Amino acid sequence: MKVLEKELFGRKLRIEHGKVAKQSLGSVMLTFNESTILVTADASEETVKGQDFFPLTVEFQEKFYAVGKIPGGFIKREGKPSDEAILAARLIDRPIRPLFPENFFNEVQVITTVFSMLNGDSIETWGITGASLALNLSPIPFNGIVAGVRIGYVDGQFIAFPTQEQLKNSKIDMVVAGTKDAVTMVEGESLEVSEEEMVEALMFAQEKIKEIIAIEEEFLSELNIEKWEVQKEIVPEEFIEDYLSLIDEEELKKVLLTKGKKNRDKVISEYKKNVMKKFEEIFLEKWSVAFFEDKKRFLENAFEEKLQDSMRKMIINENKRVDGRTCDEIRDITCEVGLIPRVHGSALFTRGETQSLGTVTLGAPLDVQVLDTIFSDEEKRFMLHYNFPPFSTGEVKRLRGVSRREIGHGHLAERAHKNLIPSDEEFPYTIRVVSDILESNGSSSMASVCSASLALMDAGVPIQKHVAGIAMGLIFENDNFVVLTDILGMEDHLGDMDFKVAGTRDGITAFQMDVKTSQVNKEVLQKALEKAKIARLKILDKMYETIPQPRKELSPYVPIMKVFKIPVSKIGEVIGPGGKNIKEISELYNVEVYIEDDGKVKVTGHNANKVDEAINHIQNLIAQVEKGGIFEGTVKRVEKYGIFVEVLPGKVGMLHVSNLKDKLESFKIGDKVKVEVMKVEDQGKFQLKQLKEEN
């Protein structure tokens, strides 16, 4: 058993190994302040024969006992992971995945289990560090040490692992992961910060990552963990050389420069088949059919590497990309709004071969999403959901539930907008945006940011500014590097970086970066952010040309909502016993009534007259019956000594027989009678007298 305790960022960090989960290949218990996680790393000892991909699974297990809660719902136990848990798992997955050896294809599972959690301890960020420790404590091959840090920016000062209170006042909320040498993963949101502030934040994060890695190194020292050997299947170099000799550089370049994603993919596939066919014709006798069939995948990998090399050289040496653009060019953009009937707001944003349909639905306060996770139990009134159907890339796949990727992309686009959404006081509707990707060739999440902004303005949501997003790429070749603007899917796959940046004309609002190289330094980040700003401003110009400001009127299909206040002391009267009054009003007028703790009442419905009638009903419920008040009441009961008359909803007074103008026998339940209030007693009871109807 090994334990290490350190003071770090004003709180206590404790790392423990060898006490729990001892049958796991690698396990570590990590406690930061009042939050505790167990991270385990396990793997199969053998690779499935012929497997050529790395099956890594990262899970983040929420335990409600960690925050002293019992799960909601009927079953009362943890079920499928929440969106927040999936996002946490993705956050851990992204920085560790590139650090596994290239030829390691064993199945690996990393699980982070939360035992105790205090909001503000950023336990999901510590999951990155925990995963690094667990993998290094195991025999699983893993190249290096990685750590994660959360950064805030309050009053001009950067803060590592800000508290919940500090985050409320922070201009930046970002999670950064990296090695000792470089930042490898970034995710976060900000309040329109500048590119200079962003670079400073990343450099600050890198220094803090070094501090955490130093602690990891101290903990791992003297343990001498023996690692499994990566069973690399060897093929003769001559086998690969024979194959590569059949690929003509100029011909491959022409193939790469084929216009259009579908055409390019088709031409590349045909060229690859032709090269393989030539190889069989010329070299099959030399290598034998059995050897060729067994090792064919190595030739396919060699083709991919050659393709990657050719694309990268073309960019570095000729400033030319596979679709003919220069490195700084954005693909053609078209924007259209109001194209879908009946929806509350819609927009189609197309950038090259990537297309997003954004739609907005405005709902009642009761349409909010009620979160029930260990991270939050709040209500969410702005949601952005992202859908990526298989037809967007011309593929055939089963339509299952929402994928982790869809949750992650939607979350990023949502963060780009969330701090610019009007407050509940300014715009009381619940807002749901959906981005349906209709076509995809790179950066569909940033297209979603743009379509969402256009659709919000089309719906009449009073956002002050448009938000646009762009994805930047990077090609490193020896000591040279080139930053690419608006990357294609192929450039993302074969390049060294995917840096998504969203924002307004005034600054950055959301960002996400994944890096495959350790060469990303301050200079690279500055250049990428500068070019991202230039591109973002060009896209924003197009968007403002399409719709410069929110529409003045909402769609006729949007529910009508009216807001007013009642005294807090009257909330119970309006709700009624067991919600009786609210239910009655909702059914009577076909409306939804929502009452907040401060007495704010929101009434929504599709008929303006019914909404007004419901409001009048509520106001009558809380109206005071005063002496001298004259009402046209309804007879509710008839007794020998008089009748009981309802003058306002729920307000029934006694009209004694001595104060009747008409005979008692002439009254029946439901009759209308004009009355005046004679006396109001302390308990709220009141006495009436009948007034003669005027002819």
Swiss-Prot record:
Belongs to the polyribonucleotide nucleotidyltransferase family. CDD domains: KH-I_PNPase (cd02393), RNase_PH_PNPase_1 (cd11363), RNase_PH_PNPase_2 (cd11364). It catalyses: RNA(n+1) + phosphate = RNA(n) + a ribonucleoside 5'-diphosphate. Its EC number is 2.7.7.8. Involved in mRNA degradation. Catalyzes the phosphorolysis of single-stranded polyribonucleotides processively in the 3'- to 5'-direction. One of its GO terms (biological process) is RNA processing. GO terms for cellular component: cytosol. Residues 628-691 form the S1 motif domain. GO terms for molecular function: 3'-5'-RNA exonuclease activity; magnesium ion binding; polyribonucleotide nucleotidyltransferase activity; RNA binding. It comes from Petrotoga mobilis (strain DSM 10674 / SJ95). It is found in: Cytoplasm. Its cofactor is Mg(2+). SMART domains: KH, S1. Mg(2+) binds at residues 492, 498. It is an enzyme of class 2 (transferase). This is Polyribonucleotide nucleotidyltransferase. InterPro entries: ExoRNase_PH_dom1, ExoRNase_PH_dom2, ExoRNase_PH_dom2_sf, KH_dom, KH_dom_type_1, KH_dom_type_1_sf, NA-bd_OB-fold, PNPase. Keywords: Cytoplasm, Magnesium, Metal-binding, Nucleotidyltransferase, RNA-binding, Transferase. Residues 559-618 form the KH domain.
